[in-house]
Amino acid sequence: MEYNNMMELKFLSKSQNESFARTVVAAFAAQLDPTIEEIADIKTAVSEAVTNCIIHAYENKIGIITIRAFILDNKITIEVIDEGKGIEDVEKAMQPLFTTRLEEERAGMGFTVMQTFMDELEVESTPGKGTLVRMTKYIGRNR
């Protein structure tokens, strides 16, 4: 597929890299002239996706997280990819409040947050191989 622009970023699954990742994606999205609310939505969704990689995919061990972002017309698609443990049942994992970590604050809300702040959300996962979260936001839709 042909895009207007694209970027790729790879970084270690360390919690201090979460804010870096969301800032890079927000800076890339800025070329679409989004509203402050649209940028905040994107940053929140990216934060959730990256945090899921750190906590669930790699279980606080070090691995590689890849973010790809693609711009086509007024649409930005963001992929957050890990090579961690994968998700056994994606449909179940996407249900609000489903969690494998009962002790965590806000547990079970990551995918719900991503769905709330983005226009489209897709999750592909293979147990033992990793997960790809694809989020899409249409910029300027409400103007």
Swiss-Prot record:
Gene3D superfamilies: Histidine kinase-like ATPase, C-terminal domain. One of its GO terms (biological process) is negative regulation of sporulation resulting in formation of a cellular spore. GO terms for molecular function: ATP binding; protein serine kinase activity; protein serine/threonine kinase activity; sigma factor antagonist activity. Pfam families: HATPase_c_2. It catalyses: L-seryl-[protein] + ATP = O-phospho-L-seryl-[protein] + ADP + H(+); L-threonyl-[protein] + ATP = O-phospho-L-threonyl-[protein] + ADP + H(+). SUPFAM superfamilies: ATPase domain of HSP90 chaperone/DNA topoisomerase II/histidine kinase. It comes from the Bacteria. Its EC number is 2.7.11.1. Keywords: ATP-binding, Kinase, Nucleotide-binding, Serine/threonine-protein kinase, Sporulation, Transferase. InterPro entries: Anti-sigma-factor_SerPK (IPR050267), Anti-sigma_F (IPR010194), HATPase_C_sf (IPR036890). Belongs to the anti-sigma-factor family. Binds to sigma F and blocks its ability to form an RNA polymerase holoenzyme (E-sigma F). Phosphorylates SpoIIAA on a serine residue. This phosphorylation may enable SpoIIAA to act as an anti-anti-sigma factor that counteracts SpoIIAB and thus releases sigma F from inhibition. This is Anti-sigma F factor.
